[in-house]
Structures are given as C-alpha cells and as structure tokens.
C-alpha cells in the first residue's frame, strides 16, 4: 500500500536529517535559517514532548510497539477505503518509528528544528515529530468533515 511508502519516506528523511545533525553539529549549537524565527539547533531529548517522562525508555519502547501495532492494524482495516485516513496513518506510523529508532539506538531522540512563534521559544523538534503532528491534524480535519457530512 502507498501508505507504507509514506511511512518509509518519513523514516528515511527523519533518520538522514538526524544523522546529518549528529555528524555535523556539536550538541547545543544553532544555525539561524530565518533570524528570530527558524534555527537548526542540535538538541537531544530523553523523554517525550517538552521532555516529559525523561529517561523512561522502557515505557517508550512498550508504548511505541503497541501503538505501531495498532496503527498497522487500523491501516489494514480502514485505510483501503479512505485515502486521507491512510495518508494520516502513514505519517503517524513513520513518525512513531522514526523516534523509536532513535530511542533504541541512541537512548535519546535527536531534535533540531527550533522555531520561535511570536517570541515564544517553541521546544526543539524533528521530522518525525512533524509527521506525527501533521498526521493527527489531518485525522482531526477528517473527523470534522465527516461530522459535517453526517449532519447534512
């Protein structure tokens, strides 16, 4: 299915970008892309979003395996007839596996996209995080659209 190709693409781009950061940047260094807006910053995270559950790797291993199994099951069952859901789940699957690879092989997640939104210093994130968020937003959009169709 094409949705697995989307997941593989996310994993590849995520892992290549993280490898480039690890090989070419010292931890904590930052390269401005757009001053006061976007930076490439070498950062490591031993937890989840905003560093929560730091150093709880076994928790993340177990949760991720269960989550990935659920996503694959859901893709097989529902994505065949729903293109937007399939794309969303492919992005989520790729993001989950991308960060899982980091946790297994590095015991931390490599983050590097650093954004300031209206002077808010947003936590540093990566391609896998972005794919997860985009996938979730697409599922929310789909749910809203389906709710509107059901009312009509």
From Swiss-Prot:
GO CC annotations, alphabetized: plasma membrane
Keyword Repeat assigned: no
Protein known as: Lipoprotein signal peptidase
Family (UniProt): Belongs to the peptidase A8 family.
Taxonomic path: Bacteria, Bacillati, Bacillota, Bacilli, Bacillales
EC number(s) per entry: 3.4.23.36
Disulfide bonds: none
A Pfam family: Peptidase_A8
